[in-house]
């Protein structure tokens, strides 16, 4: 089969390898699509956490079950998506209901081979069957929708609340749509890439900014009605977190969703105490796959504006380059794995 492997920082190798054999309790997936996440780019650059080289990247995927080793024969032939989190189920974190913090965690695309290939194995318990009418192309965005659902549920967004989103990459654009679906009013989206700002406006943001440090604070000072009740931070830059702390209303809430392990910076955290803020971190899809599938199937979340650049897997160099440079209007590169 064809597969893409990250061998070392900045080293992506395309080649052929044997089709993997599913272990007991696993399924073999004929992959359809996989989109490139910001975490994949960090993994490629070697600035991520909890990963090992070499590894086949990819965790935002869709495909078809072709074989099951053990119970689950009814899954064969079904189109599916699946949770990247392969938890042990027996450690303290799993016992607390937080498998994403599993002490023995394996993650598709980071510590076990993921979806940038023709075939992949995954525990059958991680799979979710797609309804008729939801295409494999659209379904590769189920995982990021689930991430957004988990984040919005973690921080809380109530009907009528004003929401600012910082960072309009794939996750940021999903966050704004989920917050809007929950009844939030998307007052501002900050994003340096013009084409992504345009997508945010198309999806209903009342105002968009360039993401320049201090710009959101200036906007809120001029237009107090834009002061957010909730800020969803998806860029991962410390300067953006600082701005979120400064602009959110007293008693407001901040959700930290994006992160960059290579970015550090000083922060004036006294605002958190003085304004009595609540800050919540959110990691992973949090078991929200069924809800994400339902929202996509009912057309309540738009994915086509995000799927900007399609590539065959052997054109991985260009796919990664455009995504890294955010060039040519790139919102999200994605692979058609059957091309």
From Swiss-Prot:
- State which gene encodes it: tobE
Q: Which reaction does it catalyse?
A: 2-deoxy-scyllo-inosamine + NADP(+) = 3-amino-2,3-dideoxy-scyllo-inosose + NADPH + H(+); 2-deoxy-scyllo-inosamine + NAD(+) = 3-amino-2,3-dideoxy-scyllo-inosose + NADH + H(+)
Q: Which UniProt keywords apply?
A: Metal-binding, NAD, NADP, Oxidoreductase, Zinc
Q: Do you know which PANTHER family this protein is assigned to?
A: L-THREONINE 3-DEHYDROGENASE
What InterPro entries does UniProt report for this protein, alphabetically? ADH-like_C, ADH-like_N, GroES-like_sf, NAD(P)-bd_dom_sf, PKS_ER, Zn_alcohol_dh
Protein name (record): 2-deoxy-scyllo-inosamine dehydrogenase
Query: What does this chain do?
Result: Catalyzes the oxidation of 2-deoxy-scyllo-inosamine (DOIA) with NAD(+) or NADP(+), forming 3-amino-2,3-dideoxy-scyllo-inosose (amino-DOI).
KW Iron (keyword) present = no
Would you identify the family this protein belongs to, as annotated?
Belongs to the zinc-containing alcohol dehydrogenase family. DOIA dehydrogenase subfamily.
What is the UniProt remark on how the cofactor binds and its stoichiometry?
Answer: Binds 2 Zn(2+) ions per subunit.
Q: What is its EC number?
A: 1.1.1.329
Q: Name one GO molecular function term.
A: oxidoreductase activity
């Amino acid at each position: 089969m064809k597969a893409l492997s990250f061998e070392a920082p900045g080293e992506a190798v395309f080649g052929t390898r044997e089709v993997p054999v599913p272990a007991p309790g696993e399924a073999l997936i004929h992959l359809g699509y996989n989109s490139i996440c910001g975490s994949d780019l960090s993994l490629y650059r070697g600035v991520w956490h909890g990963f090992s080289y070499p590894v086949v990247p990819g965790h935002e995927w869709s495909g078809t079950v072709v074989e099951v080793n053990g119970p689950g024969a009814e899954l064969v032939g079904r189109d599916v998506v699946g949770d990247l989190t392969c938890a042990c189920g027996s450690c303290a974190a799993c016992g607390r209901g937080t498998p994403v913090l599993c002490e023995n965690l394996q993650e598709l695309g980071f510590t076990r081979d993921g979806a940038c290939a023709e075939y992949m194995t995954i525990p059958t318990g991680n799979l979710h069957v797609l309804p008729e009418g939801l295409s494999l192309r659209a379904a590769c965005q189920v995982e990021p929708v689930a991430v957004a659902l988990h984040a919005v549920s973690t921080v809380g967004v109530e009907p009528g609340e004003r929401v600012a989103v910082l960072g309009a990459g794939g996750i940021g654009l999903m966050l704004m749509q989920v917050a809007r679906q929950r009844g939030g009013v998307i007052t501002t989206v900050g994003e340096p890439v013009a084409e992504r700002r345009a997508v945010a406006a198309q999806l209903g943001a009342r105002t968009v900014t360039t993401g320049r440090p201090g710009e959101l604070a200036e906007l809120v000072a001029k237009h107090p009605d834009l002061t957010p009740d909730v800020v969803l931070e998806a860029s991962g830059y410390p300067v953006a977190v600082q701005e979120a702390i400064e602009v959110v209303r007293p008693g407001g809430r901040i959700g930290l969703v994006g992160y960059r392990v290579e970015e550090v910076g000083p922060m004036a955290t006294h605002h958190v105490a003085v304004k009595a803020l609540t800050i919540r971190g959110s990691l992973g899809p949090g078991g929200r796959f069924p809800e994400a599938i339902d929202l996509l199937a009912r057309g309540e979340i738009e994915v086509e504006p995000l799927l900007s650049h399609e590539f065959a897997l052997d054109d991985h160099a260009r796919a990664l380059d455009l995504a890294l440079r955010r060039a040519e209007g790139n919102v999200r590169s994605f692979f058609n794995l059957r091309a």
